[in-house]
């Protein structure tokens, strides 16, 4: 995932992004939700 894509929404979705970057063990469903939230 590109950081440039996330930057604009990093503060809005900080909890989800923290989970993504710290654990890096998201399920496919969580990944889809994160993608939908950003886009």
From Swiss-Prot:
It is an enzyme of class 2 (transferase). One of its GO terms (molecular function) is anthranilate phosphoribosyltransferase activity. Gene3D superfamilies: Transferase, Pyrimidine Nucleoside Phosphorylase, Chain C (1.20.970.10). Pathway: Amino-acid biosynthesis; L-tryptophan biosynthesis; L-tryptophan from chorismate: step 2/5. Its EC number is 2.4.2.18. One of its GO terms (biological process) is L-tryptophan biosynthetic process. Keywords: Amino-acid biosynthesis, Aromatic amino acid biosynthesis, Glycosyltransferase, Magnesium, Metal-binding, Transferase, Tryptophan biosynthesis. It catalyses: N-(5-phospho-beta-D-ribosyl)anthranilate + diphosphate = 5-phospho-alpha-D-ribose 1-diphosphate + anthranilate. Homodimer. Catalyzes the transfer of the phosphoribosyl group of 5-phosphorylribose-1-pyrophosphate (PRPP) to anthranilate to yield N-(5'-phosphoribosyl)-anthranilate (PRA). Belongs to the anthranilate phosphoribosyltransferase family. This is Anthranilate phosphoribosyltransferase. It comes from Pectobacterium carotovorum (Erwinia carotovora). The gene is trpD.
